[in-house]
């Protein structure tokens, strides 16, 4: 259905306002999308802008399939560098994120850290988790993991090789400081923006 609507829009060359509760439709059909909650606009942007730079926890949680993972974390600043700590794992944020947080003079605080499932990597030493479910998707495996008291989804590429993660197996996970989103615990606002 989406392909037909896109073709129709291109053929008649006019502006469409399409209202949907299906975020996948919004992402695939819209040149620009408006995300609303309780009658209030949360964010306006291109699908890619909204996906890459969610304004708040609500937007981060509804845009993207599977949805973004959220961790309880600690944002720290030492020697002008911001780090986030989840459990026993500390990651330094990217230079771009450092600049944006510093520009807003963000203080050390407990935060909610958001990381998309395809931005989490398995490693030898990281945030520890237990596999609850392993879903083979062909080119990837979707792991449903319990880590730090949270349900986490990790997308692991199979690279053509069979990937087997039995229920109950232990995994360690890490994420890059360039892909983590830092949200205020009180307001839910993305602290970079």
Task: Outline where the language-model segments fall.
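Residues located in well-ordered beta-strands
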Residues: 46, 58, 72-74, 128-132
């Amino acid at each position: 259905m989406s392909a037909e609507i896109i073709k129709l829009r291109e053929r008649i060359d006019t502006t469409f306002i399409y209202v949907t509760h299906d975020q996948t439709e919004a992402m695939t059909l819209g040149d620009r999308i408006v995300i609303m909650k309780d009658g209030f606009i949360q964010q306006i942007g291109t699908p890619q802008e909204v996906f890459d730079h969610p304004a708040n926890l609500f937007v981060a949680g509804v845009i993207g399939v599977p949805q973004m993972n959220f961790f309880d974390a600690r944002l720290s600043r030492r020697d002008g560098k911001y780090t986030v700590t989840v459990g026993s794992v500390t990651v330094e944020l990217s230079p771009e994120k450092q600049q944006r947080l510093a520009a807003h003079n963000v203080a050390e605080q407990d935060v909610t850290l958001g990381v998309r499932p395809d931005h989490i990597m398995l490693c030898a030493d990281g945030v520890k988790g237990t596999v609850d479910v392993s879903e083979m998707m062909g080119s990837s495996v979707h792991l449903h993991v319990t880590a730090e008291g949270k349900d986490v989804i990790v997308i692991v590429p199979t690279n053509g090789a069979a990937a087997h993660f039995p229920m109950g197996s232990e995994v360690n996970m890490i994420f890059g400081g360039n892909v983590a989103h830092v949200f205020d615990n009180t307001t839910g606002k993305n602290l970079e923006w």
